[in-house]
C-alpha cells in the first residue's frame, strides 16, 4: 500500500516510508513561504495501482492560482507519473552501475539508448555517485517529496531503501512532446558539456526520457539530489551600502559571475544549441552542424561527443505548437554558421511573423478559439518583419569602433536562467551548483542579455548626493524612490564590474550604445504578453533617433535607418504604448499574467478582496473611493 497525506494548497509534498513491505507513504503538507501548517489528510493506495484516483492530489498543481482560467491552467500542470515505472528505472541504472564498475578508470562512455525508450548517462551511473546494491537486492522508492512547483517543471525528491536520494524533474505538458523532446535532449547534453568540458558543477544526470512512452509515462529527467540552500537566501538587492550582510551580497555577485565566466570561456563553432552526437542516429543529420563543436579537443572520449543543432531558446518555441514543425518552424531554428551571427535576430523575427500569420489564418477559418484581436496580430507581423529587416544592419560586424568585436561575435554558451534562484550551495562542501539549463543556447556575447536578477533599464543614479540636487531636502517618499533607483543601478554596476574583472575582452557588450543596438532583439526574446510587441517597436523607434550618430561612428551597416515610420505610425504607437502602461498599472497582477502565489490568493479570497465569478474566474475587488 502507498499512504498519501494530502493538504490543500501545499508548497511541499512528502511521501514517507511505510513499515509494510512494498509500500510507500505519500504526504502533502501545507507549508508555504509565509505560513506553515501541520494539517494533513492521509490516503492509502496500492504501490502497483498507478490508476488509483486517490493519488491524483499528489500530482496536482498547488503553488498558485490564476484569476482567469484557473481550472484549465492547473490541469495543464498536472504531472501524474508511474511510481512503479520509476522503481524499474532505478533498478535498471543500478544494474548499469555494476557494469560500469568494470570500465577503466577515467573512461567517459557515450550515452546509452535503452530498450525502454530512456537514455542513461552511464559515465554518471557509477557507484561513487549512486552507491552500491547487493546482488539479490532491489531498489525500492520509500519517500517521494514534491519540493518545487516551478514555472516549467515539477520537482520531486525520491528517497530509496538504499538511503540514496534522487531528483525527478517532470516538465509540465504546456507544449507538445516534440517541443519537450528537443528541450530535454539539449538540456541534458548541455549540462553534460558544462560538467565535462567547462568544469561547472551541475547535478549529475543519470537517466532521462523525452516522451511518455517510457516506464515513467512522462518526459522526465532523473538526476543527483544536492542537499543545501539556494544562493537566493543570501541575495538582498536593496541592501544598504556597508551593511553587515555586505559579504553575502558580494558573494552572490561573485558566484553567479563565476558561472557566467565559465559558460563563455570556450568559443564554439556555430550558433544553436548543444545535443549529444549520437542523437544523430535517430534524427536528421541536416539538423546538426557537421564540424566539431569546438576546436582543439585532445581527449578521445570527448571528441565528437556533442554537436550543435537547432536552438531551443524559449522564445523560438513558445506558443507555437499549432505550427507545422518541419515547414514553418525548423527553417528558423538554426543551427547558424558562426559567420552569420545576425541571422539569429533575423530568424527570430521571421518565425514570430509566421506565427502571427498562422494564428490569423486559423481565426479566419474558425479553427481557433483564442480570444485575440486581429489588429494585435497584424501589428505583431509588422513589428517582427521590421525586426527581421533591420537585423543585418543592427551591428557593423567589421567595425573597429567597438573593441574586440570578433570576440563579442563568437559563439558562446548562453544560460537564460543565470540567477541565485537557480544555484544551490551544497551543505557539506559549501560548493555552488548550477541547477537547470533549460533553454540554453549558443549565441554571440554581444546579443546576450544581462541576468534578470540584476537587470535594470531605469534612470541611472550612481551617487545620491552628487546626482540628485538637494537630496537631503526631499520628502521621505521621494528619497525612497531615488534610493531604489540608486540600488538597482549599483547592482547592475557591480555585476558589470565583475564581468570586467573576469572577461575584460567582453566588457564592451554592456556599453550603452551596444545595449541600445541589441534592445529590439532583447525585447523580442523577453516578451511575455501579446501586447509587448510594443516594447520592440519602442526600441526600434529609439534607435531611429540616434541612428545617424551610430552610422557616423561606424557602429551600424547602413547610413540611413532601414525602416520607414510615418507620423501616423508613431502617433499610434505612442497611444498604444500608453494604453499598455495604463493596463499594467490598473490591472492587478498583470506582471504575472494573473497568477497569484497560493498563500496570498487564499488570504485575498478569505478577506473578500478577490471574488469568484459564476464562470469560475476571479475578479479583484476595487477599493471604494474615499469621499
Swiss-Prot record:
Ranges annotated as spanning the membrane: none
Q: Which GO terms describe its cellular component?
A: mitochondrion
Q: Where is the transit peptide?
A: 1-43
> Where located?
Mitochondrion
- The question of whether Ribosomal protein is a record keyword is answered with no
Would the keyword rRNA-binding be found if you checked this record's keyword annotation?
no
What's the superkingdom here? Answer: Eukaryota
Kindly state which keywords UniProt assigns to this record, in alphabetical order. Answer: Mitochondrion, Transit peptide
Q: What is this protein called?
A: Altered inheritance of mitochondria protein 9, mitochondrial
Species per Swiss-Prot/TrEMBL record: Saccharomyces cerevisiae (strain JAY291)
Amino acid at each position: 500500500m502507498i499512504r498519501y497525506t494530502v493538504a490543500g494548497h501545499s508548497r511541499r509534498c512528502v511521501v514517507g516510508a511505510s513499515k509494510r513491505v512494498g509500500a510507500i507513504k505519500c504526504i502533502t503538507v501545507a507549508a508555504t513561504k509565509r505560513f506553515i501548517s501541520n494539517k494533513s489528510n492521509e490516503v492509502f493506495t496500492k504501490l502497483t495501482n498507478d490508476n488509483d484516483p486517490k493519488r491524483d492530489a499528489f500530482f496536482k498543481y498547488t503553488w498558485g492560482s490564476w484569476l482567469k482560467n484557473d481550472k484549465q491552467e492547473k490541469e495543464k500542470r498536472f504531472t501524474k507519473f508511474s511510481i512503479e515505472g520509476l522503481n524499474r528505472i532505478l533498478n535498471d541504472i543500478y544494474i548499469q552501475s555494476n557494469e560500469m564498475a568494470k570500465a577503466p578508470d577515467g573512461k567517459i562512455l557515450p550515452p546509452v539508448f535503452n530498450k525502454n525508450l530512456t537514455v542513461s548517462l552511464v559515465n554518471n551511473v557509477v557507484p561513487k555517485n549512486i552507491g552500491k546494491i547487493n546482488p539479490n537486492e532491489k531498489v525500492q522508492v520509500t519517500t517521494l517529496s514534491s519540493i518545487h512547483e516551478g514555472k516549467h517543471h515539477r520537482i520531486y525528491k525520491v528517497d530509496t531503501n538504499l538511503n540514496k536520494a534522487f531528483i525527478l524533474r517532470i516538465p509540465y505538458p504546456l507544449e507538445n512532446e516534440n517541443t519537450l523532446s528537443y528541450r530535454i535532449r539539449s538540456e541534458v547534453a548541455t549540462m553534460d558539456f558544462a560538467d565535462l568540458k567547462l568544469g561547472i558543477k551541475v547535478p549529475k544526470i543519470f537517466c532521462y526520457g523525452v516522451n511518455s512512452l517510457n516506464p515513467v509515462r512522462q518526459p522526465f529527467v532523473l538526476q543527483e539530489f544536492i542537499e543545501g540552500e539556494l544562493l537566493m537566501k543570501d541575495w538582498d538587492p536593496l541592501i544598504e551600502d556597508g551593511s553587515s550582510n555586505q559579504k553575502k551580497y558580494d558573494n552572490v555577485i561573485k558566484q553567479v559571475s563565476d558561472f557566467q565566466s565559465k559558460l563563455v570561456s570556450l568559443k564554439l563553432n556555430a550558433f544553436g544549441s548543444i545535443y549529444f552526437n549520437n542523437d544523430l542516429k535517430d534524427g536528421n543529420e541536416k539538423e546538426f552542424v557537421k564540424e566539431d563543436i569546438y576546436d582543439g579537443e585532445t581527449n578521445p572520449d570527448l571528441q565528437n561527443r556533442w554537436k550543435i543543432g537547432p536552438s531551443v531558446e524559449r522564445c523560438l518555441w513558445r506558443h507555437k505548437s499549432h505550427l507545422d514543425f518541419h515547414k514553418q518552424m525548423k527553417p528558423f531554428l538554426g543551427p547558424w554558421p558562426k559567420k552569420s551571427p545576425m541571422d539569429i535576430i533575423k530568424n527570430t523575427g521571421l518565425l514570430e511573423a509566421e506565427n502571427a500569420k498562422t494564428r490569423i489564418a486559423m481565426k479566419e477559418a474558425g479553427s481557433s478559439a483564442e480570444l485575440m484581436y486581429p489588429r494585435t496580430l497584424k501589428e505583431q507581423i509588422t513589428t517582427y518583419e521590421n525586426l527581421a529587416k533591420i537585423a543585418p544592419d543592427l551591428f557593423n560586424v567589421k567595425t573597429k569602433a567597438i573593441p574586440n568585436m570578433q570576440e563579442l561575435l563568437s559563439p558562446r554558451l548562453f544560460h537564460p536562467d543565470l540567477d541565485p534562484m537557480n544555484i544551490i550551495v551544497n551543505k557539506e562542501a559549501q560548493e555552488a551548483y548550477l541547477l537547470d539549463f533549460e533553454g540554453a543556447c549558443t549565441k554571440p556575447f554581444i546579443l546576450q542579455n544581462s541576468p534578470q536578477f540584476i537587470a535594470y533599464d531605469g534612470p541611472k543614479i550612481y551617487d545620491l548626493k552628487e546626482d540628485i540636487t538637494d537630496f537631503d531636502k526631499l520628502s521621505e517618499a521621494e528619497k525612497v524612490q531615488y534610493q531604489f533607483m540608486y540600488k538597482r543601478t549599483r547592482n547592475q554596476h557591480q555585476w558589470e564590474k565583475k564581468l570586467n574583472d573576469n572577461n575584460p575582452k567582453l566588457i564592451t557588450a554592456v556599453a550603452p550604445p551596444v545595449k541600445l543596438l541589441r534592445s529590439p532583439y532583447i525585447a523580442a526574446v523577453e516578451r511575455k504578453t501579446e501586447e509587448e510587441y510594443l516594447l520592440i517597436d519602442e526600441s526600434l523607434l529609439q534607435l531611429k533617433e540616434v541612428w545617424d550618430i551610430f552610422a557616423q561612428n561606424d557602429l551600424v551597416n547602413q547610413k540611413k535607418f532601414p525602416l520607414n515610420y510615418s507620423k501616423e505610425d508613431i502617433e499610434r504607437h505612442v497611444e498604444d504604448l500608453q494604453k499598455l502602461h495604463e493596463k499594467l498599472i490598473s490591472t492587478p497582477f498583470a506582471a504575472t499574467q494573473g497568477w497569484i502565489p497560493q498563500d496570498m490568493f487564499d488570504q485575498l479570497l478569505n478577506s473578500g478582496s478577490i471574488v469568484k465569478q459564476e464562470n469560475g474566474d476571479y475578479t479583484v475587488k476595487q477599493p471604494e473611493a474615499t469621499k
